[in-house]
């Protein structure tokens, strides 16, 4: 569970949040609260299905069982695609964070070295991965808690300077400087920030006692949203003016440096680099196994179903690594322009996964009238979530920086749908 928890703390929070702050100002807290509510509803839906039908790779399994084989095919491949694109984004982000110490180092170099390290780690046995990822996740969680505590201490005047209080929230255009439109536009980047939290539900589904582990894990999401997302972003907004944030640097590092805590900023940047490596490590691990499972189910080339003597899906791992490695070339030619496109694609793939959960749950309830861990506000919550998905897709079409990612995603889904239909007809 610590590994799944840690995977929800990464580039989205430490870097992606800067863009959402630029759109909404302090009112970005409303955006985080809205997306947090949607995520909670989705986690409860996933949790209800997982308690009744605990399976590994639950996203695709539930779509296949409660929507249909085409939906299961698309959801499974979409989740694999998400792991690859998130890996590419983390490799790109690594260069941004290492600019703190090595501003002249090309990002393609950091991406290449980081990828080689992660692949080498994943070629060891599963125990090495689990141990490494547990400690990386623990470091991330502890550092973020310390950051929040330090921030509120400065706000209350417990540091060397006078209390900052709430001037950075009320000044500089007020709490909602860009109006409702700013809050809405921020929803896209905030959706990206919440992407990793869904892995908590899938990890719980593989627990020894799902009927007790799943409700405990899902209900804890509320506190994680409040503490790590609202608490972390709230600390940033209290410590520094929102309009001083830059989209190409971490607001957490900028704020700590700005209030005179240079050593703390350096230490936090170390933790952020660890966080990026951790998420990349998890995506590499889970993506290879998703591709292996797709191959075992006859939905991917059989070669990817093969495993080594240690039980590792080596061919799938190396294939995923090769795809992630294309971002090294992209960073060589288009350094500084790749992050926004990858972020947009990931937001879209997240929405597909979330929609799969939501619609699966609607159909699941039609066949299962009594549930041990029933999701609240059914079916209203499902339709609220679907309306939210449509809203975010519309916003992606309105905002120029997300259009290319939206177009790429649309093409990907069309291709998957056609392949699935063609495969199904050939079997018939």
List PLM regions with ranges.
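Membrane-interface "cap" regions at the ends of multi-pass membrane proteins
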Residues: 1-17, 21-27, 40-44, 56, ...
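Membrane-helix boundary/coupling elements in multi-pass transport proteins
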Residues: 14, 55, 78-91, 194-207, ...
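Extracellular loop-to-transmembrane helix junctions
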Residues: 15-110, 114, 221-230, 405-416
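Helix-loop-helix connectors at the membrane interface of multi-pass transporters/channels
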Residues: 60-64, 90-111, 143-146, 204-212, ...
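TM-loop-TM module centered on a large, flexible mid-protein loop between adjacent transmembrane helices
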Residues: 61-62, 68, 100, 217-283, ...
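Helix-loop-helix junctions that connect adjacent transmembrane segments
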Residues: 103-106, 138-270
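Hydrophobic alpha-helical segments of multi-pass membrane transport proteins
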Residues: 121, 143-150, 291, 343-371, ...
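C-terminal membrane-solvent junction of multi-pass transporters and transport-like membrane proteins
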Residues: 135-136, 303-314, 351-404
